[in-house]
Curated annotation (Swiss-Prot):
The modification Phosphoserine is found at S271, S273. The lineage of its organism: Eukaryota, Metazoa, Chordata, Craniata, Vertebrata. Its main location: membrane. Keywords: Endosome, Golgi apparatus, Immunity, Innate immunity, Lysosome, Membrane, Phosphoprotein, Transmembrane, Transmembrane helix. It is a multi-pass membrane protein. It is found in: Endosome membrane; Lysosome membrane; Golgi apparatus, trans-Golgi network membrane. This is Transmembrane protein 45B. The chain crosses the membrane at residues 7-27, 48-68, 95-115, 147-167, 181-201, 213-233. Belongs to the TMEM45 family. GO terms for biological process: innate immune response. The keyword Transmembrane applies. It comes from Bos taurus.
Amino acid sequence: MANFKGHALPGSFFLIVGLWWSLKYPLKYFYQKEKSNQLTHHYQRLEIIEAAIRTLFAVIGILVEQFVPDGPHLHLYHEDHWVKLMNWQHSTMYLFFAVSGIMDMLTYLITHVPLGLDRLVMALAAFNEGFLFYYHVRDRPPLDQHIHSLLLYTVFGGALSLAVEVVLRDNIVLELFRTSLLLLQGTWFWQIGFVLFPPFGGPEWDQNSHDNIMFVTMCFCWHYLAALCILAASYSLVYCFLTRVKRPEDREVIGIQKLRSDHTYRKALLSGSDEE
């Protein structure tokens, strides 16, 4: 949809998944670092639930793009012209992400699925998004082209990271890098909506102003800095939470050891006095 809601919807989806990943990957990393098996019991179930939710998000996106009042309603061609190709492009983007979610579920439900195929399909979905957006804004005003082209850095960067993860699976650095780009993508979709379609009746941006292009470029850097801050805060939050949870257990173990040592000392002292 060529309006504010059409950019806020995917932006919200990417933000929700990005915030979840910013908590999930540090949690998985700390448990793997401690070589703890506590998480393995529930981790696969979490992955399946996440994949199902991402698939649901994609299906909702397709339905919204197709069946809004001015949408194509599944009509691609009518009489002598194409019908709402922009909505069809957005639907195609969502379709690939739905396939990615389904592949993620199959990876954890069926043991015969090759490991790494889920990452490969997700990389293809991200590449497809970038490919569509590259040709999405041709022959548009300069500011419109520029603000959408900045989005390509996050999309193709995420696709590249996912492609590397096919080989280097469970690499925390790659996972956090991908998460930061997804957060950036989510906030930037919202920014595009505010710039091109001001929701509160504000003044429209001059689409041909070079100063506006310079500001938008700088604003993109600010968005990424904000994404990194969110990621750092989530990482620290998970670390502090796990440290606090483990502390009572450590105290309990230390207390038991101390009681045992005190009991052994008293027993040795009593046996020594009996001999005297």
